[in-house]
Regions:
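Short, hydrophobic beta-strand segments that form beta-sheet elements in well-ordered domains
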Residues: 3-5, 23-32, 131-133
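N-terminal Rossmann NAD(P)H-binding glycine-rich loop of SDR-like oxidoreductase domains
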Residues: 4-23
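Structural signature of the Rossmann-like NAD(P)-dependent dehydrogenase/reductase core
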Residues: 5-6, 55-57, 82-91, 128-133
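A glycine-rich helix->loop->beta "capping" turn
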Residues: 20, 44-56, 79
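Adenosine-cofactor binding site in Rossmann-like domains, unifying the SAM/SAH pocket
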Residues: 27-46, 60, 66
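Catalytic loop of short-chain dehydrogenase/reductase
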Residues: 63, 76, 80-123, 135-139
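Flexible, glycine-rich beta-alpha linker
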Residues: 122-150
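C-terminal helical subdomain
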Residues: 131, 144-181
Length: 181
């Protein structure tokens, strides 16, 4: 299978890319480090279109949602295509519990992504959409916090096992990780 992943050079994207590559899948890695900015949607789309699965992981402003629309539009009606969208468990918490305006902005951007996925699902057409909401995941090697974090490689391996549940099962939404208080 050919899999495109935004934000593949660090954190969750890197862990998923590593595992899928080890399983023999062809990875199309898209990140700023290799010249693919998530805001350059036409450029990204040319790399994503020939793939079977797209992991919509990188997030800058509302570009993640805009890219979802572009890929969905391009893949509409094409059987076998799947888009995995990475959000956050933070969206399950009240906005008043967030530590500041920067986190509130991130929260609103992820809420927009999640609502877009829910609305696109009503079209009941290909591509299939999956929403993944990580809890606390240690995405940096030296990450420390008073809160517990899941190991990113273990988290990614667990997610892939769930996503590979079989052809007769469709996974629409996953909340996976250490939940935020």
């Amino acid at each position: 299978m050919k899999i495109a992943i935004t934000g593949h050079s660090a954190g969750i994207g890197q862990a998923l890319a590593k595992i899928y590559a080890a399983q023999g899948h062809e990875i199309v890695g898209l990140s700023r480090r290799n010249g693919y900015n998530i805001r350059s949607i036409p450029k990204l789309l040319t790399m994503i279109e020939p793939c079977d699965m797209f992991i919509n992981n990188a997030q800058v402003g509302f570009a993640q949602t805009e890219l979802l629309f572009a890929v969905y539009r391009s893949w509409q009606g094409k059987e076998g295509k799947k888009i995995i969208n990475i959000s956050t468990m933070l969206t399950s918490a009240p906005v008043s519990s967030l530590p500041g305006l920067e986190m509130t902005e991130y929260y609103v951007q992820k809420q927009a992504l999640e609502e877009t996925i829910r609305q696109l699902r009503h079209l009941r057409n290909w591509p299939k959409l999956c929403l993944v909401k990580p809890g606390g995941v240690a995405t940096q090697p030296d990450q420390t916090s008073p809160r517990p974090y899941a190991d990113v490689d273990h988290w990614a391996a667990t997610l892939i096992k769930i996503l590979d549940a079989g052809p007769d099962l469709e996974v629409e939404e996953i909340a996976l990780g250490v939940n935020y208080p």
